UniProtKB/Swiss-Prot annotation:
Mg(2+) binds at residues 146, 178, 276, 312. Belongs to the C-glycoside deglycosidase alpha subunit family. It comes from Arthrobacter globiformis (strain ATCC 8010 / DSM 20124 / JCM 1332 / NBRC 12137 / NCIMB 8907 / NRRL B-2979 / 168). Coiled coil: none annotated. This is C-glycoside deglycosidase alpha subunit. Optimum temperature is around 40 degrees Celsius. GO terms for molecular function: lyase activity; metal ion binding. The lineage of its organism: Bacteria, Bacillati, Actinomycetota, Actinomycetes, Micrococcales. Optimum pH is 7.5. The gene is carB1. SUPFAM superfamilies: Xylose isomerase-like.
Amino acid sequence: MTSLGTPIQGVTLYSFTRAFHARQYDLDGLIRKVAAEGFGPGLELIGFSSLRGFPDGIDDAFVGQFRDLVAEVDLIPTSLAVNVDTGIRRDRLMNHDELVEYMSKQIEVAARLGFPIARVQISLTPDAMESLLPVAEKYGVTLALEVHADQHGAHERVLALRDRYEKLDSPLLGFTADWGATVTGFAPSLLEAYRRRGAAEDLLRQVVELWNGFYAEGPPNTQKVHGERFGAFIGLAARSGRPDLGIDFAINGTGLFGPAPLDTWLEIMPWVRHVHGKFFGIDENGEEPSVPVRDLVRQLVENGYSGAISSEYEGWHWNNWQDPFDIIRGEQAVQRSAAANAGSAMITDASEARRILNSHLAQPVRG
């Protein structure tokens, strides 16, 4: 019988992008704010958006300052999100060797800063992940590929990666499970944002009905199906006289609100090394109305997951009328309540979290 998991509470600074971009906080100040609010102990950053000069410009002086800061405020680096920018060149896509070199620099910085995990992205193929395994071994960093809508745990691309992981049998290869893949409704806060942009109620009703229909059909298991759904949102906006909203509907309706059922995570659960607690808002009842946070936490606990959950508030893209710190506070309260209801607890003590995270990442995949 699997022992109950004890997930580690944490947050990604991505949740506070609006405040960071508005220069309300610099990196030092935002990390201190996170610690003071009790949003840790887990701390996740995105390399290119949080760290000036990433990756080549990260010198030893900055590394020392960063490590000293997180030690001072008693936070634990959990995951550094790194990018797979295969299309960064104007003339062609990166070739295999260029991609490995590009990723290697970022993985090295993750290790220097003290992050045990580098979140990588779905555009990495099984062959690329296999080529990066020696890099992961060199630096002692787990590569956790993010499973993000429109993909999900049972998507063909994800299963191909899982099968390669099983063949390679290394604890340094795994997944970051992003809860946006398993959403149960169109976010009310986004509908409100569309209202504020002048969208008619009838159009919003049709958007919700279209998404609900895709939810009933089940998740897209191929890129072809995803493309058809993407186009359906664009067509709806055009027919309704709001073509300016078409791409917005499509990106959010397919790329943020994934309609996969929760049990699709079971296809890859043994390889889940990190979790993005993706959510979009907290309602007047103190709950997330479109992401089944309680069920997701229970699933992790019951399957023995003891890694970090980085609360990832994505509603900042459109919600400029609510405080993201209040919203994170509310969502983490839901996580703690859900873990308790499942017979366990979220880990909020830094010393205990360090021990548990080290053990979680050291375990064989099927240990």
